Amino acid sequence: MARFPQPVILTIAVLLAIGGCRDRNNDALDVMVIGDAAPTIADPADGLLSPAQQVLMLNVAQGLVRFDARGQIEPGLAERWNVSDDGLSYVFRLGAGKWPDGRSIQARDIARLLTRTLRSASRNPAKDALGAVAEVVAMTDRVIEIRLSAPRPNLLQLLAQPELGLTREGLGTGPLQPVERTRPRGAIALLHVERIINGPDKRDLVDLIAAPTARTIAAFASGEADLVLGGTFDDLPLVRRAKIARSALRFDPVAGLFGLVLARRGGPLADQELRSLLNRTIDRDALVAALAVPGLAPRATLLQSGLEGLAPPAQPDWSATPIAARRMQAFTDVRTMTGADAPITLAIDLPDGPGARILFDRLAADWGAIGIKLVRADKINPADFKLVDAVAPSASPAWFVRSFRCTVRPLCSIEADAAMDSARTATVADQRAAFIREASQILEGKSFFIPLAAPVRWSLVGTRIEGFAENIVARHPLTGLNERLKREGQ
């Protein structure tokens, strides 16, 4: 988690002053990812990938399919695929590719790697989303089949995620490959060459590096960085204070979860009625206005609009009541619950950046109006709430509800889990959607999660970048960045 010292604006100014010290290689595009961990090829079975690892794996360890600049699916190791009419079988035909050591890529290699992801010992964060995968089978040397226990229309989007990137002996198949060349300390140089018959080869050369937010913003403002990836709500105010063209700041229209989840079983939040009062008295419109992200809308439901197979979720009954009236009633209810001489103090675990300060101030004001004090979690005040800020890997609504199953949350609903299990095994789309809606309604009724909006993901895009596009999954390939994007459908 990024840490922002108090004089962060001075830090950016100093970095801007010294930013021009490095000579730019005009041939390479300089891409920076916000984060402290360097970009390294990792094994997703070992657990969560850092932001820089996600970007690197997306670009050097393609799966059967991969994302294009717009977040659409394009061929990866598989040159084509076919889905059975019942949605229970995906058959992929591999291209004539090779591993970096020169060995031909065989279907049995891919089947083994994907099966390893599904094993109980795997800590791959994508494993739960693949619960409907019954078997991965190599049918011939170049044909592989993924068999499902129930239809999953979003399977291709899952297979394109960096967590399902395929590596052998620590190396992937591209499209970019690490190369040796002089580069900034901590950076990794990546190259992709596409051979063109009767024309010059297409060449992508990228220097990829991870750095703290202040450094990435300074590098971009000074012209040292062509592209910055990985921005969130927490560091967004830093960009707004820097002298950067408004057109350079780009937001991904992501789906996902951005809100508060219970951090422990005990404490005041064990009371469902108190959780409900807190949920009803947040001024989400004011929070969204303070974040000032184009297209960002306040959200009071676990599910969001536009998810696969679901109508827009019904809004809670209380949402039609003006916020002032909600607070007035909640103030009375809190005094009845606690008594005038027993005020409630809640602690929240948040990042340390300026965006989190905006969020904390808004929540403290909203809940202070009903007689509840909010403080930052520390050694004395254990967290009652913590922040969830996660982008959905696809448009599947199942991911939203399964984020709150009993195996991962301290407070949960057995009834909601049962509905999730029924949704996982349902073979009819309407039945599956009904079970997911049931699970979401149970979870919302108990206020185990307090939704605020969709996540915020931003990038800084320089003038040398022509092949960048915002997309719903916030995944950005580093090939073709210096080529103008074709219109959709071309």
Predicted regions and their residues:
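Long beta-strand-rich cores associated with HINT superfamily self-processing modules
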Residues: 461-490
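N-terminal lobe/hinge region of extracytoplasmic solute-binding protein
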Residues: 35-85, 115
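Structural transition elements
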Residues: 294-337, 353-357
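Extracytoplasmic/peripheral linker and loop segments enriched in polar/acidic and small residues
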Residues: 22, 376, 399-463
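Extracellular/periplasmic solute-recognition and catalytic clefts
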Residues: 182-195, 207-265, 389
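Aromatic- and charge-enriched surface segment that lines or borders ligand/interaction sites
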Residues: 56, 80-123, 219
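Periplasmic-binding protein-like
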Residues: 265-309, 359, 443-448
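Gly/Pro-rich hinge or "lid" segments in bacterial periplasmic/extracellular proteins
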Residues: 150-207, 214-215
